[in-house]
Amino acid sequence: MWADDYKVDGFRFDLMGHQPKDVMVEALAEVRKIDENTLFYGEGWDFGEVADNARFDQANQINMAGTEIGTFSDRLRDAVRGGSPFDGGVDSEGNHPLRFNQGFGNAAIANEETKVDQDSINGRLHNQDLVRLGMAGNLAEYVLIDYKGDTKLGKNVDYNGAPAGYTKMPSENISYVSKHDNQTLWDNNAYKIATGTSSAERARMQSVSLSTVMLGQGIPFIHMGSELLRSKSMQRDSYDSGDWYNRVMFDGTDNNWNVGLPREDKDGANWDLIKTIIADSTAKPDADDIELTKQQFLELLKIRSSSELFRLDTADEVMKRVDFRNVGEDQVEGLIVMSIDDGVSAGDDLDPANDAIVAVVNSTNESQSFKITGATGFTLHDVQQNSADDTVKGASFAAETFTVPALTTAVFVQAQGDAQGVGLPVDNSDKDVSSIPPYGQTTVYVRGDMNGWNPVEGWAMSFVSNGVYSVTGSLEAGNYGFKFADADWKTPNFGCDSVELANGSINLGSDGNCQLSVAEAGSYTFTLNAINELDDNVEKAVVSVTKN
């Protein structure tokens, strides 16, 4: 009815993860018979009584990959905002997780609780990896270099024990940094930003945070009023708090900051911290801050709309065109440098005006310069050359180097001439794809009769390279059934029904499991080549067992 009679062409599903996947897929197919461009998206959270597919295959983030149904991505959200929506209260050391868990968008200046130990620094650098991955559509197969210098697929980057990258197409990535649940972006930042930081700097942090969504691949989701520095007076959950906390001042005269303490049932544990924060007069923006943020947002919208390169349709296009510089062990914290190629090596000419785009997101409180060897002919985007923000007008390019002021996102374009030019191709020279474990951080075991079918440490396979895992163990003469599996019998979990046997291997039978007959006791090496998990052109895993 809604699609046919009322011409509704987009549907958002609350707690979609509590629905069966097949119901959602079937519903989309039916609605697209009326309008083939209908959009489905929803909350693919995995929790509660249906968690881990306990009752059916859920419509959660991981399962919805490949369905063309979008899911909200908490990966970039948490990385930009800092911490998680569940932070609150005081920890065992008397510190506030809501305060010390700074994110990419608000960590320019350390606050009094900011942690500077190596684990905390690594955590912030890991956040930058999550931001990059989110801006690349959160693709499971996207190749990036992490903060340790390791080449990884998106699905092998960690997010609280789950794969950070999980989509198969960018449109499945609903990218956001604020919505009706939990604190607004302004209020969340107020928890993190150092005391005494000017309201103008706070407003710039808001714009920088929003730019990670507006310039990334996927579908941007913008919370009403984000461009107006909207506050709900630190209210975490405002669905039942009335207009006093939920109002949006569309005239830009005020942002509803500090109109009262939030409700005790949701935020009582944070009242002492909130009272300290609202006592800081710099935490309240003025009308000029609000107006500039609004204009910066409208400019980001114009920039996104100006080029198809910000709206790539397929994973293949993203992986051929989108690259990140300032990566690895020596990267500058707080700096994202993203290039999008439209040169001849990228394929079709998607942007007839430009051969390449470089977006520099500087969330630090200092001007940053970054050199990309081979970059030529870039100029600041004409929207920003005529910006309402005088600061971004100071961004420049010269001698292969992009320079961007503090707390600023600048977009540079390489204008196309009479025909498609060289552009700025993805740099694969420093990416070692042979070092990518097909199963990421998951430990693969040989589990079978030789170890009671348990995930025994001595039978944990080591990743070698190029998709190959190996383990050597002692076996007595006899017959053994076994599988290649993880500790939870999830992924991987297979025997020899659907694999190929490598040359030189002892013959392996199959009855669902692999069947090995050992004629002589001794040392045996088991290998698994799972390159098929990384290369769609390889159909099956290849396995072998050899006597040493």
Residue map of PLM features:
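Active-site-proximal helices and loops of the catalytic beta/alpha 8
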Residues: 15-166, 226-273, 348, 373-376
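C-terminal accessory region downstream of the catalytic core in glycan-modifying enzymes
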Residues: 201-202, 300-308, 365-397, 406
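C-terminal beta-strand-rich structural cap/linker in extracellular carbohydrate-active enzymes
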Residues: 395-430, 524-534
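Aromatic-rich carbohydrate-binding modules that target alpha-glucans
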Residues: 433-479, 487-513
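A glycine-anchored, Pro-Gly-centered beta-turn/N-cap motif
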Residues: 357, 366, 376, 476-478, ...
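Active-site groove signature of glycoside hydrolases
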Residues: 1-19
